[in-house]
Amino acid sequence: MSRNKAFFINGGAGRVVCSIPALEKFAEENPDNDFIVVCEGDTEFYKGHPLLHAKAYDAWHKNLFEDKLKDMELVSPEPYRVWEYYNQKANLSQAYDIAINNKGLRDLQKPKIKLSKQETLMAKQVCDDVKEKTGKTKTIVFQPFGRGVFEEKGTISDFSGRSFEPDTVVNLVKTLSKEYAIIFMGEIAIEFSKHGVTEQVAIPQGINLRIWSAIISQTDHFLGCDSVGQHLAYSLKIPATVVIGSTFKENVSYPNEPTFKILDM
């Protein structure tokens, strides 16, 4: 007996975004399978999606097991354990596709992120404000820190090796601010004026990743490390410069994307 499937997607927002093309492929190739997606992280990047919005459930959704799961085949795709991934032949989206669809390595569409009008307007206001305050006509989103970054007694560290060094961040902001209005993407804010940066840097706080997606969608360029921002830029077709540290560019980024410049350190 063939059962409908429930795909459990875990991890951070980058993994959620990268799962989208594989789930779209599954729907295309299995039209009779009324599958659902159980989000062990967050549903935010499935929201508004023409297909996945109605299929996405939080793990704590009321009566999820009784109403759905007990009659379904439960699947927990893990892209990091896909052979093509850990041998640098597949990126994260392709690894999800192999784990979910088992069709081997193939080209996929970019993830679809659907933004609301409200999100777009909020992002436009952020971009317009920083351009007005700096007098610059071009904007750049800069995400220098990955998920493993932390601050202790005024020192910023990331033992995973994915983040920029703080001194490098300051020097890049000094250089970029000559040409761009900078929007700093990060939970740890730096007071750049104390480090000799004369131009104003926008440091939005307390906004969710969907608003960040909308902001990135309206900027001229993205600069960042191996973190969620580059996946958003790729999905939204924004040119990017990505600096890779302890991870492999073939896995975590898009070296074949013409609009991406990847610096493998």
Residue ranges and their predicted role:
Residues 4-6, 139, 181, 221:
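Structural motif
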Residues 1-93, 211-214, 229-231:
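Active-site and donor-binding regions of nucleotide-sugar-utilizing enzymes
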Residues 72-82, 89, 93-95, 137-140, ...:
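Active-site anion-handling motifs in enzyme catalytic cores
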Residues 41, 143-146, 185-188:
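Short, well-ordered beta-to-alpha junction loops that form the rim of enzyme active sites
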Residues 82-166:
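Mid-sequence helix-capping/hinge segment at a functional interface
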Residues 17, 153-251, 257-260:
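Donor-binding and catalytic core of enzymes assembling or modifying cell-surface/extracellular glycoconjugates
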Residues 53-59, 202-205, 260-265:
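Short acidic-hydrophobic, aromatic-tinged amphipathic segments that line or gate anion-handling sites
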